[in-house]
Amino acid sequence: LVGRYRKTHLLAGETCFTPGTDTPAFEAGGVRFGINICYDTNFADTARAVADTGATLIVCPANNMMRRAAAESWRDRHNPARAERCRETGLWLISADVTGERGERVAWGPTAVLNPQGEVVAQLPLEAPGLLVFDLP
C-alpha cells in the first residue's frame, strides 16, 4: 500500500461511506498520478485537484454495474465525461471498469485510455472482459 484516496463525490446509495477530502498524488514507474473513483470524474473539481498536484495522469477505477435501464442511459456518457476532464486539465486518463451481468444488473465498461485532448486512444470492446495494455508517451 503506497497511499489512500477516498472517493470525493458519493452516490445516494453510498451514504455508509465518508467522502474524502484529500487528493494525494502517487508515483509508479516514473509517472505521477492521482485517482478519481467512478462518479468523481463527473465533476471538474476532482480532476482539477489531481492536476494541482503536478500529476500527468488520472486513474479512474469504476464499478458501473447498474440496472439495465440505467446502464443503457450511461452507456455512451462515461467517455465523454472523462474526456471533458482531460481537456480541462491537460491530463491523461485511464479508466478500469467492470463488464458483464449479475442478476438484474449489467456493466459495459468502458475500460479505456484517453489523451489530454480527450480522445480515446485505446479501449477494450464494450461488454468484453480483457486486459488493456498501453504505453504512455
Q: Could you describe each region identified by the protein language model?
A:
Residues 1, 22, 110-111, 130:
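Conserved beta-strand and immediately adjacent loop positions that scaffold enzyme active sites
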Residues 1-57, 61, 67, 71-80, ...:
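Active-site catalytic loop in hydrolytic enzyme cores
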Residues 42-129:
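CN hydrolase (nitrilase-like) catalytic-core segments centered on the catalytic cysteine
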